[in-house]
């Protein structure tokens, strides 16, 4: 007898095929259909991805592809120890881009041009030339004010603001690039 092949295709779209007789119960529980697409008869228009949407693979529940990664733990802060590198950032695994380095160096040069001094220079301390304290909070002699460029602290004249350092830093960066 004629019968529709059992699959996930709705019966109105299934093509009628002859079922061979004498199939075992196992073979009957896993029917096959050589052409699971809709019949070519009629004026039925289906989307091109119809077979993909109605395939057995689309019925399988899948796990979410979103995975949440936590950031690696930061090393513990040891009191009394400072990293003397001005390029040290909390995430050392992520390298700085050339633009970030140029921006940092431009702002360092801008602080020098605006008469800012590191804490060791402002307090006339005998520290190595390239030693940059991480902070200048409550260390700048009056009337100078504390300004930070990255992690480097500077004692600047009162008229110098962070925005002024940034703008002069842009000009310094263009000088470095030859612009």
Curated annotation (Swiss-Prot):
Subcellular location field: Secreted
Bias-annotated ranges (Polar residues): 1-37, 60-70
Tissue: Component of the acid-soluble and acid-insoluble organic matrix of calcified shell layers (at protein level).
Alphabetical UniProt keywords: Secreted
UniProt region (Disordered), positions on chain: 1-41, 60-82
One GO term describing the cellular component: extracellular region
Major subcellular site: secreted
Protein name: Uncharacterized protein 2
